[in-house]
From Swiss-Prot:
<dbReference type="Pfam" id="PF02660">
    <property type="entry name" value="G3P_acyltransf"/>
</dbReference>
<keyword id="KW-1003">Cell membrane</keyword>
<keyword id="KW-0444">Lipid biosynthesis</keyword>
<comment type="subunit">
    <text>Probably interacts with PlsX.</text>
</comment>
<keyword id="KW-0594">Phospholipid biosynthesis</keyword>
<keyword id="KW-1133">Transmembrane helix</keyword>
<keyword id="KW-0808">Transferase</keyword>
<comment type="pathway">
    <text>Lipid metabolism; phospholipid metabolism.</text>
</comment>
<keyword id="KW-0443">Lipid metabolism</keyword>
<dbReference type="GO" id="GO:0043772">
    <property type="term" value="F:acyl-phosphate glycerol-3-phosphate acyltransferase activity"/>
</dbReference>
<keyword id="KW-0812">Transmembrane</keyword>
<keyword id="KW-0472">Membrane</keyword>
<feature type="transmembrane region" description="Helical">
    <location>
        <begin position="50"/>
        <end position="70"/>
    </location>
</feature>
<feature type="transmembrane region" description="Helical">
    <location>
        <begin position="3"/>
        <end position="23"/>
    </location>
</feature>
<keyword id="KW-0997">Cell inner membrane</keyword>
<comment type="similarity">
    <text>Belongs to the PlsY family.</text>
</comment>
<feature type="transmembrane region" description="Helical">
    <location>
        <begin position="75"/>
        <end position="95"/>
    </location>
</feature>
Length: 200
């Protein structure tokens, strides 16, 4: 029963497309706007800082709460729920099994299972996005650093964290190609939240 509950809770919460709903509050179909990705960065770029912040928060929180709700069952079930939350975000039943790239939701899982790894991710992400303004690059490097941190912390679940990270990175294949080609879009995330609203 714990397996079924963890799978259901994880997928259900992860599948709630908060970024889609939040963008709709401003009359935007995020699937048909900007990059078309159902995620916080696309909401930020096209709906502004307030809506972008909401999208980021809820995409993180839904994965966090899914893991938290099965905490009493033990670490194995937390990891199952977390994995299903990320899969739910990327393949949402509410969006015909389409969704985002899973970065914010993976971050939420990291925070819920091993908070230090979440802090490592956020620190690396913030530094790289501030320096390069490449959100995709910051996200991918942040995920890898967090996974490496968990490995050196001696946690058995580092393999799951690495798998989630690699899954999200694979969903960035178009971004990776654009980074290689030198035409990946830059986004001044910090500028958005401090009133600059700068987009490159």
């Amino acid at each position: 029963m714990e397996y079924i509950y963890s799978i259901f809770i994880g997928y259900f919460f992860g599948a709630i497309p908060f970024s889609f709903f939040i963008a709709k509050l401003k009359g935007i179909d995020i699937r048909k706007t900007g990059s078309g990705n159902v995620g916080g960065t696309n909401v930020l770029r096209n709906a502004g800082a307030f809506y972008g912040a909401l999208a980021f928060f809820f995409d993180i929180f839904k994965a966090y709460i899914a893991v938290f709700l099965v905490k009493g069952f033990g670490i194995k079930f937390m990891l199952i729920a977390g994995t299903m939350a990320v899969l739910g975000h990327c393949y949402s039943i509410f969006l015909k099994f389409k969704g985002g790239k899973g970065v914010a939701s993976t971050f939420g899982v990291f925070l819920a299972v091993y908070p230090w790894s979440g802090l490592v991710f956020f620190g690396v992400w913030l530094f790289i996005v501030a320096v390069t303004k490449y959100v995709s690059l910051a996200s991918m490097i942040g995920l890898i650093f967090a996974s490496i941190f968990v490995f050196f912390a001696g946690k058995d679940f580092w393999v799951i964290f690495l798998a989630l990270s690699l899954f999200s990175i694979l969903r960035h294949k178009d971004n990776i190609q654009r980074l290689i080609n030198g035409n990946e879009r830059k986004t001044d995330v910090i500028g958005y939240f401090f009133g600059k609203g700068k987009k490159n």
